[in-house]
Design a protein with these regions (language model features):
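Active-site-adjacent structural elements in enzyme catalytic cores
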Residues: 1-182, 186
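N-terminal low-complexity segments that are often proline-rich with Ser/Thr-Pro
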Residues: 188-190
C-alpha cells in the first residue's frame, strides 16, 4: 500500500479542480469529489450512471467540520464516540447555512455522513478545506470495488486519479443509521 504524501497531494490537486478521484476506505473504494461543488458532484452522478434522486454519502475527518454543515445532537454524539471513525453512516439534519451541494442531498434537509477509518482517506480529508461526497466507485448496480485496479477497470480514463490504498479491509458498504427512525435504511458491515 502506497499512501505517501505525494499521492495524497496529487489526489487533492484533482479534487481542487472539481474532478472525481478514486479513494480507498475501509469498506470499499469511493468515487470522491468536493461535496461543496455542484460541478464536481454532478460528475459523480454522470460517471456512476446514478439517478440524481439517490443522495450521496459525505465523508468528514472532524466533528468541527461536520458541525459547519449538520445539526449534531446527543444521540449522534453517542454513536460518534462509539463507532467513529468506522463503517457507519449517520443521517443528520442539514443546517440551512451548509455549503453542501444541493445535488448531494437531492434538495432534502438531511445528509448522510461518515468518518472513514482508512489512513489514506483520513490523511486526504485532513488537508482539504471541504468534505468529500464519496459513494462507492462503481457504475450503479455493479459490484463495489475493493482495490485500485477494480476502480481503474470500472472507469478507465474517465476519472483523473485513483489513490492506492491496498485492499479495502471490509469489502461491504457501511451501515446506514437514521437517528430519528428505524429500521436501518441499509444493513452493512457493522
Amino acid at each position: 500500500m502506497n499512501n505517501n504524501l505525494s499521492n495524497i497531494k496529487k489526489g487533492k490537486y484533482f479534487l481542487d479542480k472539481h474532478n472525481c478521484i478514486g479513494l480507498p476506505t475501509e469498506t470499499v473504494y469511493g468515487l470522491a469529489a468536493n461535496a461543496y461543488s455542484n460541478k464536481a458532484v454532478l460528475k459523480i452522478f454522470k460517471l456512476k450512471n446514478r439517478p440524481r434522486n439517490n443522495p450521496l454519502i459525505v465523508h468528514y475527518h472532524s466533528l468541527e467540520m461536520l458541525k459547519k454543515d449538520c445539526i449534531v445532537n446527543k444521540n449522534f454524539l453517542k454513536l460518534y464516540n462509539k463507532f467513529c471513525p468506522g463503517p457507519l453512516t449517520l443521517i443528520l439534519k442539514l443546517k440551512k447555512s451548509s455549503k453542501v451541494s444541493k445535488f448531494v442531498t437531492n434538495k432534502k434537509n438531511t445528509l448522510a455522513i461518515r468518518f472513514p477509518s482508512h489512513p489514506t482517506a483520513i490523511k486526504l480529508l485532513k488537508i482539504l478545506k471541504y468534505p468529500l461526497a464519496a459513494p462507492s466507485a462503481n457504475i450503479s448496480s455493479r459490484l463495489s470495488p475493493v482495490t485500485k485496479k477494480h476502480v481503474e477497470e470500472e472507469f478507465g480514463k474517465k476519472i483523473k486519479y485513483v489513490i492506492e490504498g491496498g485492499n479495502s479491509k471490509i469489502g461491504l458498504e457501511s451501515t446506514i443509521c437514521l437517528l430519528y427512525t428505524s429500521p436501518s435504511p441499509r444493513d452493512g458491515s457493522e
